[in-house]
């Protein structure tokens, strides 16, 4: 969306949010803006249904993931046709919880008693985002101001470590006073059962008898740059392994595994080794004590186009490979030497994180 269209959209949202008055609602109202169900659904489920009215604004693609919660929440699909409905819901909310960058918030006229809390869709960051993303033309003052308006709408950030706090400060212009060191709701699933038992049960369910290598690369805007690993060649060279390619849903590959129905966290729970690149998933995998090999065939290009941060550049070279042959050789020769690199990113991620988050919401919304 170009700068002029964004400017017009923000103007429309600003006018509507000033015209629309808050609806009178019997119970405190919380609105969730959801792109990633794994970040939002744990909070929805944990909140007491009798205390709150809950509304979810989400994409048409993600709306089906809320079917199990249909009795507990109102769902509004985020389309241009429902813009007025979205703003009406926002205006009556005491708290708005988001998991991503939402352009609407750059024009939304927040009321004085509203708070917006960001639960970012990742446990950490190895690539640049926000205003540090090289794709943002920082010399274009209008473009930068449009981004800032969206970022400045957020009052608080849920974080699991100081490193992610640092990323928010660098990339989004956040301050230390905005950090809520409660941990992240997305990690709650890893504390709800014995991991070894869950891993064995899942492997049995999906018929996996070997060690599982999971390839979860980050998304590249040029779809031609998104690669799957040759499954047949990998498994021929490493007969003790089963490989699953889990590419971005928008990437069409007729010759790779159809695992679209299995969410990434379930695949990670089954995995023995992660293969990734600039994604945040290696950070999340470290919480499960799963090592990662970084298959970074386009490292130089990606760094130039998007940017890789100081945490990526601190990864030891022994964990990086640039070809499939080197990847296979590293697993053959060094597998026993690899260990998770990012355990210190989980200082505040605990089995009590979700409870701390809901306690905070109760305190802020019902006071």
Name each model feature, range by range:
Residues 31-33, 88-104:
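Short N-terminal targeting/anchoring amphipathic segment
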Residues 39-50, 170-171, 179-255, 354:
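Conserved catalytic-core segment of nucleotide-activated headgroup transferases in glycan assembly
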Residues 73, 111-188:
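Active-site-proximal region of nucleotide-activated glycan assembly enzymes
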Residues 78-91, 247-283, 287-288, 299:
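Donor nucleotide-activated moiety binding/catalytic core segment of transferases
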Residues 96-97, 155-161, 274-275:
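A short beta-strand/loop micro-motif in the catalytic core of glycosyltransferases
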Residues 349-367:
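C-terminal alpha-helical cap of glycosyltransferases
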């Amino acid at each position: 969306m170009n700068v002029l269209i964004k400017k017009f959209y923000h103007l429309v949202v600003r006018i509507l949010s000033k015209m629309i008055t808050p609806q009178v609602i019997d119970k405190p109202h919380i609105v969730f803006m959801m792109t990633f169900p794994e970040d939002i659904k744990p909070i929805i489920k944990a909140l007491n249904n009798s205390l709150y009215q809950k509304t979810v604004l989400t994409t048409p693609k993600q709306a089906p993931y809320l079917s199990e919660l249909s009795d507990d929440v109102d769902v509004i699909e985020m389309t241009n046709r429902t813009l007025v409905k979205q703003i009406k819901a926002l205006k009556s909310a005491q708290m708005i919880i988001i998991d991503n960058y939402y352009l609407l918030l750059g024009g939304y006229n927040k009321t004085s008693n509203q708070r917006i809390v960001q639960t970012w869709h990742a446990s950490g960051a190895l690539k640049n985002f926000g205003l540090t993303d090289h794709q943002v033309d920082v010399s274009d003052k209008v473009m930068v101001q449009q981004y800032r308006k969206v970022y400045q709408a957020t009052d608080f950030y849920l974080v699991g470590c100081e490193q992610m706090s640092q990323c928010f400060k660098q990339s989004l212009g956040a301050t230390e006073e905005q950090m809520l060191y409660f941990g992240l709701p997305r990690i709650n699933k890893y504390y709800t059962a014995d991991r070894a038992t869950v891993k064995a049960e899942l492997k049995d369910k999906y018929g996996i008898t070997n060690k599982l290598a999971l390839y979860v690369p980050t998304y590249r805007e040029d779809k031609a740059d998104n690669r799957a690993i040759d499954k047949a060649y990998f498994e021929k060279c490493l007969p003790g392994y089963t490989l699953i390619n889990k590419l971005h849903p928008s990437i069409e590959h007729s010759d790779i595994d159809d695992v679209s129905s299995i969410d990434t966290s379930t695949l990670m729970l089954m995995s023995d080794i992660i293969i990734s690149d600039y994604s945040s998933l290696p950070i999340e995998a470290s919480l499960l004590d799963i090592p990662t090999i970084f298959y970074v065939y386009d490292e130089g290009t990606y760094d130039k186009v998007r940017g890789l941060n100081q945490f990526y550049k601190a990864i030891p070279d022994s964990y990086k490979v640039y070809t499939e042959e080197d990847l296979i050789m590293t697993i053959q020769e060094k597998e026993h030497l690899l260990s998770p690199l990012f355990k210190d990113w989980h200082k505040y991620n605990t089995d009590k994180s979700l409870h701390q988050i809901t306690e905070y919401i109760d305190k802020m919304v019902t006071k």
